[in-house]
Amino acid sequence: MSENPIPGYLPAEEGRRRRGAYAIPSLFTTANIFCGFYAVIAALKGYQALGTDLGEATRLFDNAAKAIGFAVLFDALDGRIARMTKTTSDFGVELDSLADVLSFGLAPALLAYAWGYGVTPDIYGLEMGKAAWVISFLYLVCGAFRLARFNVHARRTVTAKDRRQFVGLPIPAAAGLIAAIVHFSPTPLLAQSARSFEVWGNHVLVDSAVLGFLMLLLVAALSGLMISTIRYRSFKDLGVGALSPRWTLLLLSLLVAGIYFYSQWVLIFLASAYVVHGLAMKGLALLRLGRKEPASAEVSTPIKSEP
C-alpha cells in the first residue's frame, strides 16, 4: 500500500529533475560566455596578424564576428527556454547580464577597434588612434548601463507594454550589427581598396580612412541608442502559438536556408532593419504628435466675445 507524500515534500528524483531544468538555461548562457571569450581571443589574434598575414587576420576577424552571432542566438534561447520551462531565477538574470557584458560589450568593441577604426589613418584632423579608444570604451560603458537599466526594470511590475518593448536598443542588437558588418566584409578596413562614387555629379573617393571614420560614427550612434528611451520590439509576445505550425516551420526554414546560403546579406539586413525600425517608429510617433498638437491647440483656444 502506497503512502501519500508529505505536502511540500519533493522526492529526490523529482528534485533532481527540477534542478536539471534550472540548469538548462544556464548551459545556454555558458555557451554565450564561451562565444564572447572566443570572439575576444580571435579579435586579438587578428589584430596581431595584421602586419604579417592579412589572410589570417581576415579569417580571424570573420570568426570573431560569427562567434558574436552565435552568442546572440544563445542569448535569445536561454531566456526563452527559461520562460517556457518556468525556471527563471535571479541567478540566471545576473549570469545572463555578466555574459552579455562580455559577448555584446567587450567583444564587439574590441572587434570594431581591431578590424576597423583602430588601425585606419587619421582623417579630418581627428587622431583616429585616440578616438578609437574613446568610442570603444564609450560603447562598452553604454552597454553596461543598458544592461543595468534592464535589470532594474525587470524587478519592477511588468506590464503588457513592457513585455512587448525594450527601452533603448538592446545590446545584443548593437553587437549583432557590428558583427554583421564585419562578417559582410571581413577584410580589415586598413587593407580595403578605395572606391569612387558619383554623388550629384561629383566624384567622391571612399578610402580606408573614410570607412574607419564612418564605422567610428556608427559605433558612437549605437552607444547612444542603447542608453536612449527609444522603444524597440522585444518579440517576447510571439510565443509558440503565435503562428500556426505550418507558418512557423515555413518561416524558420526560409530563415535557416537564407542564413546558410546568403549569411552575409541576410544577417546584415536583419541587424540593420532591427536597429532602424526603432528609429522609424519613433519618427512616426513624433510625426503623429506634431499633427495632433495644432488641432488640440485650435480646439482649446477660447473665443473672445465682442465688447
Task: Map each language-model feature to its residues.
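Hydrophobic alpha-helical transmembrane segments of polytopic
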Residues: F28-A31, A64-A71, I135-L138, C142, ...
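Topogenic membrane-insertion module of multi-pass membrane proteins
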Residues: M1-A76, M281, P307
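Select subsegments of transmembrane alpha-helices in polytopic membrane proteins
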Residues: P25-I33, S97-F104, V167-G176, L243-T248
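Helix-coil boundary and interhelical linker segments in multi-pass alpha-helical membrane proteins
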Residues: Y38-K66, L110-V134, I181-L214, F261, ...
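C-terminal membrane-associated helical module and adjoining short loops/tails
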Residues: M1-E13, V158, R163-P307
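Alpha-helical transmembrane segments of polytopic integral membrane proteins
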Residues: F37-V40, F70, F74, P108, ...
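C-terminal ends of transmembrane helices
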Residues: G79-D90, A144-K161, G168, I227-K236
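Multi-pass membrane catalytic core of lipid/isoprenoid biosynthesis enzymes
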Residues: L27, R59, K66, M84-L147
